[in-house]
Amino acid sequence: MENTEETERFSNDICVLLLDSDATCLANLSEMIRKCGYKVVATTRADDLPLIINNKDKKIDLVLAEFRLIEMNKYELLEKIRSICEIPVVVSGAHVKDAIVECLCRGAKLCLEKPLMENDFKILWQFTVSRQRNFRSQIDINPPEKNHSITHTQSLGAELKKNNNNSEVETEDLDKYKDELGQGNKRKERADTDTGEHTEKNNGSDLGDQKKPKLLFADDLQNETLEAVPNIEEANNERKAPTEIKKNGESSEKKSPELVCMEEELQKWSAESFIDLTASVENESQDPLESVGDSVGPHEIPLSPPESSNNNVAAQLQMPTHEALDEEVMQDGLSLSDLEVDLQEGHGSNKELFDKIFTDLAKELKP
């Protein structure tokens, strides 16, 4: 720790009592303590401590004593100093580490191990300052009581009197205002004998003038609004139309769309297509048969009328060949190739065949 100005200021007023049984060590320590700015009182005898401490000429602020003395035990010195007065004691020695806790419990403020250095003495003033502060705090705990008196000057009394008069005036005005307010809230009804109408009379006419005026919509502003929006009346009428219908009790339910029967439409479509197909078949049946010798080779078989008519019908229906149709089977287990064979053999009439085809199609398309 550096020797600051604050350390020098406090150390100049502190007197240290140095106690050591070795005279050489005592002289060296005294020199180092004086260099730090302390006043030193040195002795080698522990029996001289009471005389030195009680001496009024030199006030002792701190005791720096060796831990092991010849005349006394290591703890007897602390107990003796504590019995005389409350002075901070700093203990020094070569083997002080073993008894630091015991020394602190018996009243020691600090334990220093030898050899001592100059920096060890620069912090001694802190123990004396803390002791002085504790002593002053004990003195100021119960300060003497002082008799305090309050004197009112003439200006203060006049001001208080003026404030009292103003408060009385304010209370009178407040009472008057409450009375007027109570009268204004009272309304009386009177009946006109001629017309039989009831009118209200307000006793507090002044309070009625203070009411908030009503907001009126000017005619000029309304006309300008109607000119700016010419269709506003029509929009209002359209908006009121549903409410008027609802008030009159008329039903405003929307009509549900008509349902279309798919089966009837399918039968109608099948009948029309059947008529067209029968007409085309009859026209082809009236054509002359193809000649065998002219258009057919020696190893070719001429087409018979049923075969040519069946092929034309299949082409009009845009149906695939029997090889691809054999893979597709109808719901009743009958393939289109079987129907073609029946046509070639002449089983059944064309009308029955087409009726069967369209009924099967109707079953598949029926939802």
Curated annotation (Swiss-Prot):
Identify one Pfam family in the record: Response_reg
What does the UniProt keyword field contain?
A: Coiled coil, Nucleus, Transcription, Transcription regulation, Two-component regulatory system
Source domain of life: Eukaryota
Region: Disordered, residue numbers: 158-213, 227-259, 282-312
Q: Which residues, by range, are in coiled-coil regions?
A: 158-192
For biological process, the GO terms are:
cytokinin-activated signaling pathway; phosphorelay signal transduction system; regulation of DNA-templated transcription
Family membership noted in the UniProt record: Belongs to the ARR-like family.
What is the protein name for this chain? Answer: Putative two-component response regulator-like APRR8
Please state the gene responsible for encoding this protein: APRR8
